[in-house]
Amino acid sequence: MVRIIVKNVSKVFKKGKVVALDNVNINIENGERFGILGPSGAGKTTFMRIIAGLDVPSTGELYFDDRLVASNGKLIVPPEDRKIGMVFQTWALYPNLTAFENIAFPLTNMKMSKEEIRKRVEEVAKILDIHHVLNHFPRELSGGQQQRVALARALVKDPSLLLLDEPFSNLDARMRDSARALVKEVQSRLGVTLLVVSHDPADIFAIADRVGVLVKGKLVQVGKPEDLYDNPVSIQVASLIGEINELEGKVTNEGVVIGSLRFPVSVSSDRAIIGIRPEDVKLSKDVIKDDSWILVGKGKVKVIGYQGGLFRITITPLDSEEEIFTYSDHPIHSGEEVLVYVRKDKIKVFEKN
């Protein structure tokens, strides 16, 4: 285990014209599972490379526990001395080596006997349930088995920190849940500090105890997954984390008005953006007698589609072209007027810049 301290780290390229990281500060605790979430170009890979020692911060400092490992453009502790294991997006297995040889590769430059190497490889392979494929080449393995070999190779030197870079993007959807569960189980068993980087919130939320959101090189929010989902600092963060309706409205004494809809919230600016997740919207032809739901007005069904056992229904408020979508277990015909309800404690309000 190791504690990672990132202090005022910035990274610029092309003589300062491209800012990849902008004054990032993070503390990752011993044994913590920490996730970095962000869109393409947010600086996630640059952040990972600085942690790994493959790049250095232009300004700022990086500590492993109390040890300064990089500072202001200088590499103080090289990658091989940081006790890091990495799993890349492509897994990067050597096609001409068996699974055993791939896993053992990081040990070849260490002063270990063949018996010690064999014992360590088999120990890690057993944890990951791949001991029966150690003599197979990567081309003979399934995608899930290849990923386990890559994970075993990262763990074979008993690292203090495990870095995962978009680790599940090459797996098909049906295998991802089990792969995420495996990573979490192995981390808990070994107690290694874990940093996972991904653009997919499902990857991050399934593994991480805390999450940092990177947008255009800035760390804009850090918190538990459920806190980020329910209380995002911006509509951009909200949309990164999950599906959300984004509605721009006018602020009045009655709240935020969007056509025929009125959201009873307080905002200091003249215009505001309402964010409401599809599961927090309910459409009905009848009055709903449930205090957790509030009526915000009427809308007209514009589009209805069927996906995954549910109907995806898109409506427009009367007198507005804004669109709101939600999911329902029963269809509502296009063109019908409906009452629009929302969960009153789930309305998200963002000031319009």
Swiss-Prot record:
Recorded topology in the membrane: Peripheral membrane protein
A single GO molecular function term of this UniProt record: ATP binding
Subcellular location: Cell membrane
Pfam family, one: GlcV_C_terminal
Phenotypic consequence of E166Q: Strong decrease in ATPase activity. Can form dimers in the presence of ATP alone, without Mg(2+)
pH-dependent activity: Optimum pH is 6.5 for ATPase activity.
Protein residues bound to ATP: S40, G41, A42, G43, K44, T45, T46, Q89, E166
SUPFAM superfamilies: MOP-like, P-loop containing nucleoside triphosphate hydrolases
EC numbers, comma separated: 7.5.2.-
Cytoplasm listed as a keyword: no
Record field: catalytic activity: D-glucose(out) + ATP + H2O = D-glucose(in) + ADP + phosphate + H(+)
InterPro entries: AAA+_ATPase (IPR003593), ABC-Glucose_import_ATPase (IPR053598), ABC_transporter-like_ATP-bd (IPR003439), ABC_transporter-like_CS (IPR017871), ABC_transpr_FbpC (IPR015853), ABC_transpr_MalK/UgpC-like (IPR047641), GlcV_C (IPR040856), Mo/tungstate-bd_C_term_dom (IPR008995)
Domain-related comment: Consists of a typical ABC-ATPase domain, comprising two subdomains, connected by a linker region to a C-terminal domain of unknown function.
Family the entry assigns: Belongs to the ABC transporter superfamily.
Subunit structure: The complex is composed of two ATP-binding proteins (GlcV), two transmembrane proteins (GlcT and GlcU) and a solute-binding protein (GlcS). Forms transient head-to-tail homodimers in the presence of ATP-Mg(2+).
Reported function: Part of the ABC transporter complex GlcSTUV involved in glucose uptake. Responsible for energy coupling to the transport system. In vitro, as a free subunit, exhibits a constitutive ATPase activity.
Family annotation (NCBIfam families): ABC_arch_GlcV
Protein's recorded name: Glucose import ATP-binding protein GlcV
Organism expressing this protein natively: Saccharolobus solfataricus (strain ATCC 35092 / DSM 1617 / JCM 11322 / P2) (Sulfolobus solfataricus)
Gene name of this polypeptide: glcV
